[in-house]
Each structure stands twice: as structure tokens, then as C-alpha cells.
Amino acid sequence: MNTIFKISALTLSAALALSACGKKEAAPASASEPAAASSAQGDTSSIGSTMQQASYAMGVDIGRSLKQMKEQGAEIDLKVFTEAMQAVYDGKEIKMTEEQAQEVMMKFLQEQQAKAVEKHKADAKANKEKGEAFLKENAAKDGVKTTASGLQYKITKQGEGKQPTKDDIVTVEYEGRLIDGTVFDSSKANGGPVTFPLSQVIPGWTEGVQLLKEGGEATFYIPSNLAYREQGAGDKIGPNATLVFDVKLVKIGAPENAPAKQPAQVDIKKVN
């Protein structure tokens, strides 16, 4: 049994390492996002005894780790996997020593990490090229302006209040999209306007929000070097991704009679 637990730990480590490769941190799932795997809500007693329910729970736990590996491109042979598990469980002779099993798993992990790194590099190159092409075409559209840093923006509603500085706290409403239109974050999904220090978000936001007056609205087109660069962010923002944000500057400072609320997602936080 000791061998099973050690191999399971290595398997889980492989899944987590592959998932983390090239990513800063994963955004917590919003209320609108579906669970990774669907589940039938019902009486667990239908599975059987407490022992059988626990067995099912352990299978689900291991299955999730293996599914995570598969999603990162590291598939295993389930037939061989279950054969080995059954042999150990039944006390039969197994085809590997504990040392050999650890050596094989470490080699497997290294190979998968190398594949993940190569994929990350390829994705970064492709995303950068797509982003540059998008921004080149977008720059010629009516109302779109480009700053010296490369940030593009379009004012959709002029505000009438004050303009913030980079040292201010601001309250905003926003929606973030990839250039293919995929929405990856929004204040609406997070429960309403969010409040944060303007100096603690990605450079494209720090610069862009300063162009607005209170009540003003704009669309920001943020090149990757002003966003998350080659590292990307979470599961939705790939390496060198160009981002599009619709933003409304509700006010400078926190809402009256309400504490400052940090963004529920990571998608506009500053990259260290």
C-alpha cells in the first residue's frame, strides 16, 4: 500500500506541475462558470455501503488528477494503471520495484514538463503574432487612438468628473475579452463594481483609466507587454495574449458607505 500512495502522490504532483507550467496563478471560478465535471446530485447511499461510497470518492479524486493530466497533454493507459493497482491491492507480484516506479514517474514528469514548455513557447509566439495583427487593423478604425506605450483606446462616453492619477483608488465596472471575443472576466459576474488601487493593476489599466473622467466609458485594447506578457494568467489568458476591456470609471475612491472591495478575479492584477 505504501507504493500505491507514493505513486499516487507522484501522479498528483505531475498533474499539478503540468497545470502550473507557464502560469502565474489561476483565477477562482465565478458563479457563472460550470464545474469542471458534471455531477448527478442524488442520494449517495445508492452507491452502496459507506465503504463503497468511500471507494467511489477515492476513485473520483484520482480520476480528477488523471483528467487534469490528460487536459495538459499527458495521457496514461488506464488498463495498465488499473492492472497495477489491482495487483498491489491483491498482494500479487508487481513488475516494478518501488525505486523503479519512482524513477519512471520522474522521467515521465520531466518529459511532460518539456512538452508543456514547448507548447507554451509555441502559444506565446502565435498569440503575439495574432495580437500584433489585430492591433494593426484596429488602429485604423474610427475613434481608436494609440498612446506612446502602444495602448489603444476608444472613448465611448465622455465623463464629467475628475480624472484619476496612478496613486488613486478607483471604482469601476468592466468586462474583459480575448481578441476572439471570449469573455474571461467581468465586474457583473463578480457581483458589481470593483474598487482597487490603480497602481496595483496591469500597466494597460493603470494608463488607460487615467484617460477617463468620472462617469466616462472606454474600450481598452491592451497589447501583451502591457498585460500579462509571456507568462499569461490563469487558465483563460494565454501567453502574450492581447486583451480587450470595456471600462466605466464609476468614481475615484471607494463607493460611499461601503468598504473598498478588491477584484474577485486575478485578471487585472499587476504582474510582479
Curated annotation (Swiss-Prot):
Residues 29-48 are annotated as: Disordered. Pfam families: FKBP_C, FKBP_N. GO terms for cellular component: plasma membrane. Residues 1-20 form the signal peptide. Residues 167-253 form the PPIase FKBP-type domain. Present in outer membrane vesicle formulations which are used as vaccines in human. This is Probable FKBP-type peptidyl-prolyl cis-trans isomerase FkpA.
